[in-house]
């Protein structure tokens, strides 16, 4: 397997402004790898599409693009097999991927970030990750509703007391009680679908740090390839918006 040297990744990002070694506590404070390593698959998915767009637009060569895509695939394979592990000393998952990629394919790896900022990259990664989580949760809800409906159908004549204000009020069936939860969960499902649809409406990639880039990017291409309806119309909104996170958290809290 391929190895990436420890202790260097986080330091390389910060050493340029300092004459002495950066204190480990500073690196630890600035590091987000423990949180954002869960986004590594989505980060590489976005990078692959970004590389394809750069080659399509003539910003990087086809050879660079091929090397980048094969390098990303090899990283994914080695992570899956255990031949490669995420460096806990890396500042973030994006740095880990880029430096691992460059170690494997050379200078082509350095050209991957052309026309892209950490800001639009992170905004994209979060959307892709939450979309995947939302789809997983939606599938779980659908399966749970199916089980509830099946059990309710088996208990259409099983009588039980219905309560109001902690007092027995009216006789109902166990099936009727179960179906109340099925209907609640179906509303939860709609909330997840609605939040995800809004998340998928606009792709932030290409927004740059906050005001785009002078590179001739094809934002429609990347938006479509990544499953978005369109590029976000305002670059500042694209990189600063996090209301989709709150919306999904709201749907989760109601479901719980």
Regions found by a protein language model. Give the residues of each.
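FAD-binding core of flavoproteins
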Residues: 211
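Active-site-adjacent "gating/activation" loops or surface patches in catalytic cores
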Residues: 219-239
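Glycine-rich anion/phosphate-binding loop at the beta-strand->alpha-helix junction
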Residues: 188, 192, 238-256
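Solvent-exposed alpha-helices and their adjacent loops that cap or buttress functional pockets
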Residues: 214-215, 240
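Short, Lys/Arg-enriched N-terminal segments with co-localized hydrophobic residues
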Residues: 1-8
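Short linear loop/turn motifs
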Residues: 67-70, 236-241
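A helix-coil-helix interface module used to build multimeric assemblies
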Residues: 8-208, 216-225
């Amino acid at each position: 397997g391929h190895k990436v040297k420890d202790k260097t990744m986080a330091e390389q990002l910060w050493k340029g402004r300092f004459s002495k070694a950066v204190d480990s506590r500073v690196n630890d404070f600035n590091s987000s790898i423990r949180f954002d390593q869960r986004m590594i698959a989505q980060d590489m998915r976005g990078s692959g599409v970004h590389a394809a767009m750069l080659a399509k637009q003539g910003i990087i060569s086809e050879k660079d693009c091929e090397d980048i895509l094969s390098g990303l695939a090899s990283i994914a394979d080695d992570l899956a097999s255990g031949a490669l592990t995420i460096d806990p000393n890396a500042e973030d998952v994006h740095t880990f991927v880029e430096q691992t990629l460059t170690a494997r394919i050379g200078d082509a790896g350095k050209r991957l970030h052309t026309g892209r900022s950490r800001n639009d990259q992170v905004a994209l990664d979060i959307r892709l990750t939450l979309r995947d989580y939302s789809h997983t949760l939606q599938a779980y809800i659908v399966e749970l509703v199916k089980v509830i409906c099946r059990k309710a159908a088996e208990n259409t004549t099983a009588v039980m007391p219905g309560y109001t204000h902690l007092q027995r009020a009216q006789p109902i069936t166990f099936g009727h009680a179960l179906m109340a939860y099925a209907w609640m969960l179906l509303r939860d499902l709609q909330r997840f679908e609605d939040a995800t649809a809004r998340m998928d409406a606009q792709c932030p990639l290409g927004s740059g740090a906050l005001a785009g880039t002078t590179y001739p990017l094809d934002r429609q291409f990347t938006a479509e390839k990544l499953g978005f309806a369109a590029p976000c119309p305002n670059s500042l909104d694209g990189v600063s918006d996090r209301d989709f996170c709150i919306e999904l958290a709201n749907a989760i809290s109601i479901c719980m």
